């Protein structure tokens, strides 16, 4: 039995899952392949895209999704994670969890007898990265040979993109202020994968260096859930990294803009960019549904 806790868990299947997602989007798959299957969805953090896309995805696949807020579960009152995992495994065919701590998801998967899918942790967001690659493929025609630059905080989304880019044939750079680099272990793993696939990973505080020959400019909020106490300092540190028309001009002609949403216009991105012709953020949001249907099919079928 396999789980999706990290991009590394699907490093040999990424392209197959993306092909599945494309087929689901184009209506080429069998109808209701997960009829009679159920998915428990545990949420420790609030969500719009993750909750709706998994819920609708299971419905469209013929199965049922059960929304479980951690505050409503005994887990929220101190029941050990292993006990929760063992009990849920007796009732459902899979567990999706959106958690605060990555270690909690690892522990849940360790004791679960059914596949566990990460809907986001403080370390990674693999389903988002799959949706992102599907979106890039649609808009640029291919992934191989393209380059993505993540601008801003080296967060969970950035971590998953770093791991996935070389697997699909892309180079990747990260433009961030010093002190906000992505997780060191993730960067080392990404560089190892890049070496294996003859690709490049670059981390730089210099925008011109990071945005050289870039086809995709990607950003995310400067203040993630849990970082609110640092908000004022973060806004100062990230101000030069706002994705606006000047920054976009450093990328290639025809470059697209991406953001996993929710976005704060006037902070990490200007309104003219996110609402402009280069922005593909709502296609990207929609593709969460198709990518996750592929994930559910892959792990629960």
From Swiss-Prot:
<dbReference type="InterPro" id="IPR006132">
    <property type="entry name" value="Asp/Orn_carbamoyltranf_P-bd"/>
</dbReference>
<dbReference type="GO" id="GO:0005737">
    <property type="term" value="C:cytoplasm"/>
</dbReference>
<feature type="binding site">
    <location>
        <position position="74"/>
    </location>
    <ligand>
        <name>carbamoyl phosphate</name>
    </ligand>
</feature>
<dbReference type="GO" id="GO:0016597">
    <property type="term" value="F:amino acid binding"/>
</dbReference>
<dbReference type="GO" id="GO:0042450">
    <property type="term" value="P:arginine biosynthetic process via ornithine"/>
</dbReference>
<feature type="binding site">
    <location>
        <begin position="260"/>
        <end position="261"/>
    </location>
    <ligand>
        <name>carbamoyl phosphate</name>
    </ligand>
</feature>
<keyword id="KW-0808">Transferase</keyword>
<dbReference type="GO" id="GO:0004585">
    <property type="term" value="F:ornithine carbamoyltransferase activity"/>
</dbReference>
<dbReference type="Pfam" id="PF00185">
    <property type="entry name" value="OTCace"/>
</dbReference>
<dbReference type="InterPro" id="IPR006131">
    <property type="entry name" value="Asp_carbamoyltransf_Asp/Orn-bd"/>
</dbReference>
<protein>
    <recommendedName>
        <fullName>Ornithine carbamoyltransferase</fullName>
        <ecNumber>2.1.3.3</ecNumber>
    </recommendedName>
</protein>
<comment type="function">
    <text>Reversibly catalyzes the transfer of the carbamoyl group from carbamoyl phosphate (CP) to the N(epsilon) atom of ornithine (ORN) to produce L-citrulline.</text>
</comment>
<dbReference type="InterPro" id="IPR036901">
    <property type="entry name" value="Asp/Orn_carbamoylTrfase_sf"/>
</dbReference>
<dbReference type="GO" id="GO:0006526">
    <property type="term" value="P:L-arginine biosynthetic process"/>
</dbReference>
<dbReference type="InterPro" id="IPR002292">
    <property type="entry name" value="Orn/put_carbamltrans"/>
</dbReference>
<dbReference type="InterPro" id="IPR024904">
    <property type="entry name" value="OTCase_ArgI"/>
</dbReference>
<feature type="binding site">
    <location>
        <position position="220"/>
    </location>
    <ligand>
        <name>L-ornithine</name>
    </ligand>
</feature>
<keyword id="KW-0963">Cytoplasm</keyword>
<feature type="binding site">
    <location>
        <begin position="47"/>
        <end position="50"/>
    </location>
    <ligand>
        <name>carbamoyl phosphate</name>
    </ligand>
</feature>
<comment type="similarity">
    <text>Belongs to the aspartate/ornithine carbamoyltransferase superfamily. OTCase family.</text>
</comment>
<keyword id="KW-0028">Amino-acid biosynthesis</keyword>
<feature type="binding site">
    <location>
        <begin position="224"/>
        <end position="225"/>
    </location>
    <ligand>
        <name>L-ornithine</name>
    </ligand>
</feature>
<comment type="pathway">
    <text>Amino-acid biosynthesis; L-arginine biosynthesis; L-arginine from L-ornithine and carbamoyl phosphate: step 1/3.</text>
</comment>
<feature type="binding site">
    <location>
        <position position="156"/>
    </location>
    <ligand>
        <name>L-ornithine</name>
    </ligand>
</feature>
<dbReference type="Pfam" id="PF02729">
    <property type="entry name" value="OTCace_N"/>
</dbReference>
<dbReference type="GO" id="GO:0019240">
    <property type="term" value="P:citrulline biosynthetic process"/>
</dbReference>
<dbReference type="InterPro" id="IPR006130">
    <property type="entry name" value="Asp/Orn_carbamoylTrfase"/>
</dbReference>
<feature type="binding site">
    <location>
        <position position="288"/>
    </location>
    <ligand>
        <name>carbamoyl phosphate</name>
    </ligand>
</feature>
<feature type="binding site">
    <location>
        <position position="98"/>
    </location>
    <ligand>
        <name>carbamoyl phosphate</name>
    </ligand>
</feature>
<feature type="binding site">
    <location>
        <begin position="125"/>
        <end position="128"/>
    </location>
    <ligand>
        <name>carbamoyl phosphate</name>
    </ligand>
</feature>
<keyword id="KW-0055">Arginine biosynthesis</keyword>
